[in-house]
Amino acid sequence: NSSEKSQTIPVIGLVAAGSPTLADENIEKHIPYQESLFLSEFDYFLRVKGLSMKDAGIMEDDLVAIKKTSEVRNGDIVVARIDDEVTLKYFQSSGDQIKLIPANNDFEEIYINKETEGFFIEGKSVGLVREN
């Protein structure tokens, strides 16, 4: 379908400490994609490092489609920044307490107060691409 919009989306690799996720130095490359491949709009792909979400089917080097938003619900897979680190985890909130939950029993849950300085939600996962 030639009327379908095709565009390129940035791929974010390792995020430099202290820099915004979409800072130019964090962008590995841009890849083309067709809008029809995803149900939701998104802003960038985040390249997965590590196996903390493997039981959710998210493996090392996968590209997770991230929509930039701080509006997330319990059970969403989110990109959270804690000081200079970015992590991909399940989100669970109760009052002011937030629990970031890995999908791998080898990793610990992260407990944090939503008012903690240096903590914020950068976005949520809306899809996944496995390159190869």
Q: Where are the regions a protein language model picked out?
A:
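Short, positionally conserved secondary-structure boundary motifs
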Residues: N1-M59, V86, S93-Q97, E122, ...
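C-terminal regulatory/effector modules of DNA-binding transcriptional regulators
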Residues: M59-N132
